[in-house]
Amino acid sequence: QLEGRIGHMAIVRTKRATARVNLAAIEHNIKVLKETAGVPVLAVVKADGYGHGAVPVALAAKSAGADWLGVAFLDEAIELRNHNVPGPILAWLLHDTDDFAQALDLDIDLSVTSLANLMEISALAKMRDLNARIHVEVDTGLSRAGVAKADLENFFSKFKTIDNVE
């Protein structure tokens, strides 16, 4: 639970511990990563910023030049938007019960693992007269989630025909 902020420090308190997170160090690390890699940076702030406070960590990352923010669950992305965190946010572990309409309304990118999710998101985007930004999760062999290798050709051939997604 974020308790407050003192300068470049975020104070996060739980029942058993208090963390003082040096946000300037996070900003420095993002800047070094961005300069060294020379490519866009997606800062992962899932799980409440790994227990460091998702909102202050996300804002520090954006301040340092992170191009994207990534979270596991849609409710985490919604929390960031509700705290006015700007820029692209990707939520990659979606559930059938998630409110995809709210995600579209809040300009959140979504990762899909099935044609059913893709079709639902497409229909919602069409009703809003916008294009949903979709990322396709591919099962790379761990059998955890994603479109299976055997289904990729079929998935992408159908993806190309679906309106209101990019």
Predicted regions located by residue number:
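Active-site-proximal beta-alpha core segment in soluble small-molecule metabolic enzymes
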Residues: 10-13, 17-20, 25-27, 39-166
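Conserved PLP-enzyme active-site core in the AAT-like
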Residues: 36
